[in-house]
């Protein structure tokens, strides 16, 4: 692969990471609202099917986008391939010799160690993508602790943070570009819940 192709691959990986992180934050906001906001509880009880579809859709998106990022299949461009190609092309990363005093082999080794440190979480992610999501109708919605058995939201956060670190360290050393996750539509959920609550309140007043 050329440097241009690697840069394009990095951008695609980060776009997937942004989707996963934004959906995780929206899911987190929903779970927090469920615990403290009576308005949300009221809306949830009135439209349980809608919210179950919404929550399952968020979970599915988070899992699938992360699974693409950590895909190690030969024809996939994931974090592992990004590390391997970077390892094979040390001359692309001259900045690490001149500016930071870190040898290329040490820089790549650090990223490989970081990647290997989350092996069990990566394996569980793949397992869920391949098997569990086909039966997500059986799962409880708005679970603040875990998504599926043995796989927690803390694991999701760790996978996102690790991917973010590896992608950006390679991108910065290759091009000087740092990618920042931009929050998208994060406030929409509050507006949706408040408007739904107002609508139900007005209907109740009319019925009475």
Task: Show which residues each predicted segment covers.
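Amphipathic alpha-helical interface segments
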Residues: 1-121, 146-208
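Histidine-centered, metal-coordinating catalytic motifs and their short helical/loop contexts
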Residues: 115-143
């Amino acid at each position: 692969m050329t440097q241009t192709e690697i840069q394009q691959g990095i951008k695609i990986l980060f776009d997937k990471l942004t989707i996963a992180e934004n959906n995780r934050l929206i899911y987190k906001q929903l779970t927090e609202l469920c615990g403290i906001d009576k308005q949300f509880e009221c809306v949830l009880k009135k439209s349980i099917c809608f919210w179950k579809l919404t929550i399952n859709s968020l979970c599915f998106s988070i899992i699938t986008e992360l699974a693409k990022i950590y895909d190690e299949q030969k024809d996939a461009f994931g974090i592992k391939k990004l590390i391997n190609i970077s390892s094979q092309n040390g001359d692309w990363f001259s900045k690490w010799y001149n500016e930071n005093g870190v040898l290329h082999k040490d820089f790549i080794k650090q990223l490989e160690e970081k990647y290997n440190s989350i092996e069990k979480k990566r394996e569980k992610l793949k397992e869920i993508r391949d098997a569990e999501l086909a039966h997500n109708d059986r799962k409880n919605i708005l679970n603040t602790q875990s998504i599926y058995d043995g796989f927690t939201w803390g694991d999701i956060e760790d996978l996102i943070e690790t991917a973010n670190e590896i992608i950006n360290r390679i991108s910065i050393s290759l091009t000087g570009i740092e990618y920042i996750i931009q929050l998208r539509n994060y406030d929409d959920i509050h507006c949706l819940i408040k408007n739904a609550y107002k609508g139900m309140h007005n209907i109740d007043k009319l019925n009475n």
